Structures are given as C-alpha cells and as structure tokens.
C-alpha cells in the first residue's frame, strides 16, 4: 500500500451540522477474534495471524459493497515520522504508533474509515466524519462491522456482548466521541464547571489527542464512558444530546463576550491574526492557541474570508511530524518553529 500522508482527511472538511463548534464526530468499535488472546498477551505469530485474517477480510466483496475499498498498511513498514502523522490526523493512537510487533492500519482513501489492528483489541474500527454527524458515522461503522463479521469470527458472549480487553468497552464495544472547539466557555471561565458536570452523566472529557492529553487550542473530545447494558442507539443519542447542549452553551458564551467584552474580543482576535500572518517563529502550542482565537473570530464574523476547512487542515499541518514530512527532513525544534511560522503565513495569505 502506498500512503498519501499529506492527503486531507474527510473530517477536515469543515462543513455540516454544528460545524461552527463541532469539528468532528467519531464512532469506534472494539472487536476481537475468537480463540486468540488479547493483543497484550499475543506472540508475534498470533499477531501476524490477526493481520493476515484482517487483510483477507477487507478484500471480501461484501466489505467493498458496505464501505468501499480498504487497504492495509503494516506499521513496521512505516518510519516513526509517518506513524506519527497518522496520530496527528487522528487515524491511529499513540500506543499503536509506539508499539512494536505485527501491527497494521487499514484505511479508506478519504480516511473516513480506518481500522487499527493489534492495538488494545484485535480490531478497532473507526469512522470519522466532519461536524455533528454521529448518526451518519454510526451507520457507516455498523455497515462495516456487519460486513467484517461475515468474514471474521468475533468473540461474543450472549450475556455480556462483544468481549474486549478493557472491561469498560465490553457490551457493544462502542465508543462515540465528538471533538469541539470551546474557546468562549474557556474565556468566560465556564469550561471547568460545565465539563466536570458531564462525568456525572457518563461522559468523559479529554484533550485534542484523546486519553491523557491536554485540551490544546481550546479543543475538547467528549465521549461515552460505559458500553455494557446500553444499546448503540442509546449511547449515540445521549452523546448527541450532550454535544448539542455544549454547542448551545458555547454560543451563549460567545454572545456574552460580544455584549460584555466586544473590544477586548476583537483586539484578541486581531492580535492573533497579526501574529500568525507575521511571526517568524511559532511553537505548535502557541500556534494552536492563536488559531483558536482566529477560528473564534472567523466563526463570529470578526474576520472574513477564512473557511473552516483551512483552519482544520492547519490544526494537523502545524504538528511536528507533518511539518518534517512535508519538508522532507528531520528538524530541530527551532527549525520546526521557523518552518511552522512560514507555512502558516503562506496558507493564511491564500
């Protein structure tokens, strides 16, 4: 398989319901093959067996009819920087990128469908779409899952459901999540109370790259915590309601800023745009924060002519691995910061 790592993923399109606040919607299904230990207990031969079975399954006509052409890429054939780009594009986890052994990623051309092979579970099927499209992502994931289950013997228990390495995934094996941009809630100091209240309704809040990461650039991921005893529709409907409520609260906070701190807000946005279009050195953390301010300005019509697609692409293109891959060489942190600033200036200049 020949990977086009610089391709823009489907989730970056920046169009769809609630796209002013909801960046992407993701459905992930955890599945394991019957008769084999979980990946953390497998030897390399067993890992290779899983990769081989998945490779055969994705070539089945039924799978093609359900989701189109899928291609498998063994991770051992990728350089560390190439693996890291897949993390930066939200296609694989940091754990899969870092691990050795027989591991793989399966991708559709538009990267809306991907499968991590031999991560925490044998298969982690993911459907990742732009904006608030959880139900559409679920339909795609469900079709892919049904087609794959026709080719693979998944570990399933009549009482407990799909068996997974982590007990919190047992049952449907489904993790639904949305990625939201919530700068006004942060600026008005409402983010802490609002987001901490979500844990009481079974919703987890994480940073830009999921579990264990910080909410850089005012971007948060919210997801369901438990799958056992709940149907797929219940999980998705609950997270959809939470996401829409969060988006409404963010809009209310934006209006509060507009009414009470209009000049400070416009100054903040203008300064951020000025730095991004003129800076010669930019760290990834500073760039993400400034892009958050500019995105807020674009969404509130303080800045005209910037579309969501470009801002979503920049979120990935400013990351260390993507920068080095596009430059065709390994860079020192300072070289990356200089290259990042030049790239941002060029892309914002249009």
From Swiss-Prot:
EC number assigned by the record: 2.7.14.1
UniProt family annotation: Belongs to the ATP:guanido phosphotransferase family.
Q: Write out the residue ranges of the motif RDXXRA motif of the pArg binding pocket involved in allosteric regulation.
A: 336-341
Q: What Gene Ontology biological process does one annotation of this record name?
A: phosphocreatine biosynthetic process
Q: Origin organism of this chain?
A: Moorella thermoacetica (strain ATCC 39073 / JCM 9320)
| Domain Phosphagen kinase C-terminal residue range list | 21-253
- Tell me yes or no: is Nucleotide-binding among this UniProt entry's keywords: yes
Q: Which residues bind ATP?
A: 24-28, 90, 124, 175-179, 206-211
One CC-aspect GO term = extracellular space
The record's InterPro entries line, in alphabetical order, gives: Arg_Kinase, ATP-guanido_PTrfase, ATP-guanido_PTrfase_AS, ATP-guanido_PTrfase_cat, Gln_synth/guanido_kin_cat_dom
Which GO MF terms does the UniProt record name?
A: ATP binding; creatine kinase activity; protein kinase activity
- Taxonomic lineage of the native organism: Bacteria, Bacillati, Bacillota, Clostridia, Moorellales
- Keywords, sorted A to Z: Allosteric enzyme, ATP-binding, Kinase, Nucleotide-binding, Transferase
Tell me which domain of life the UniProt entry assigns to the organism this sequence originates from: Bacteria
Which Pfam families does this one have?
ATP-gua_Ptrans
Record text on activity regulation:
Appears to be allosterically activated by the binding of pArg-containing polypeptides to the pArg-binding pocket localized in the C-terminal domain of McsB.
Catalysed reactions, as listed in the record: L-arginyl-[protein] + ATP = N(omega)-phospho-L-arginyl-[protein] + ADP + H(+)
Its recorded name reads: Protein-arginine kinase
Instruction: State what this protein does.
Output: Catalyzes the specific phosphorylation of arginine residues in proteins.
